[in-house]
Amino acid sequence: MLKGTFPIAKFQELQTPFYYYDLSLLQNTLDVIRNEAGKYGYNVHYAIKANANPRVLELIARNGLGADCVSGGEIQAALNAGFPANKIVFAGVGKADWEINLGLDNDIFCFNVESLAELRVINELAGKKDKVAPIALRINPEVDAHTHAKITTGMKENKFGINLSLLPSVFQEIKVSPHVKLIGIHAHIGSQITDMSAFRNLAIRINEIQDELEQVGLQVENLNLGGGLGIDYYHPNHLPIAAFDNYFAVFNKLLQLRPGQRVHFEPGRSVVAQCGSLISRVLYVKEGETRKFAILDAGFTELIRPAMYDAYHRIENISSDEPVELYDVVGPIC
């Protein structure tokens, strides 16, 4: 959120803490995404887990993006916001029966399957409805995302995806599962990735996996490369929109597509993070023997990331231009 664009007078009337979203910046970001992805005919599905605010979702849906969901609640939120079902993908390692049924009942675009057990459940539930579920296999590509360990998802020690060594047994299961149809492969290696070499390595690895699939007679219509593009938390005023141009260009340069293949992406944080701010007020100023504290009415109940894994979020004083002093900014939670 750009300092100087906050409606301070309006904020004075509101109870804090609250989240504020700059929908103009979000629209500018969506314009860039549509332009850069459109150069290559790429399909973009917004990862709803990044922010499920209804107004935010409605604006993204109006701009023609699809939705990447990891729960039944997110599928319903996407439908309510106007995302067409044929642009909704359903990922996640723990899909409950009711969530799978919700996807089946609404004829969503694809289920990103993360295990052999899940494949069997989807086949069984689709069979009860006399339907064929479109699936993509989320593979574990063994690509290091060069990001925080708690948001890395593409290594063999992670809970996500199917290890490459298990693919032969999964393919065999698909052959005897009449109510699923393999339409793609899916990979997502992590979040807040700012090193483009990770995406280059992913593209190269996908090429290798495609070659291996063809050796056993398999070719898929869709490649889903997930998301993960990072943002600049330290200088949000200078770089309010993520480097989507470089991001999509990496895959356009390196991916070896087969005729007719469609490419999909699932960005989340990079779409919405810079347009959002947590607005709080200072309740008390407290001076200890060794440090000074500014005590806010917001805590990790509103912003847990710094406490969870030392994530950095820039703090701005939007109601004063007085000289800066050093304080510990803390909340009411112990």
Segments the model singles out, each with a brief description of its role:
Residues 5, 261-334:
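Charged (often Lys/Glu-rich) extended helix/loop segments that serve as interaction or gating elements
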Residues 61-62, 126-129, 153, 279-281, ...:
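Short, solvent-exposed amphipathic alpha-helical segments in soluble enzyme
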Residues 1-133, 172, 176-181, 211, ...:
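A charged N-terminal "starter" segment
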Residues 45, 134, 222, 262, ...:
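Hydrophobic "anchor" residues on beta-strands that sit immediately upstream
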Residues 24, 47-53, 70-73, 93-95, ...:
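Active-site beta-loop-alpha junctions enriched in small/polar residues
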Residues 80-83, 104-105, 127-131, 150-152, ...:
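Solvent-exposed alpha-helices and their adjacent loops that cap or buttress functional pockets
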Residues 66, 89, 110-112, 136-138, ...:
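Structured core elements
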Residues 141-284:
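Active-site loop/helix belt of alpha/beta enzymes
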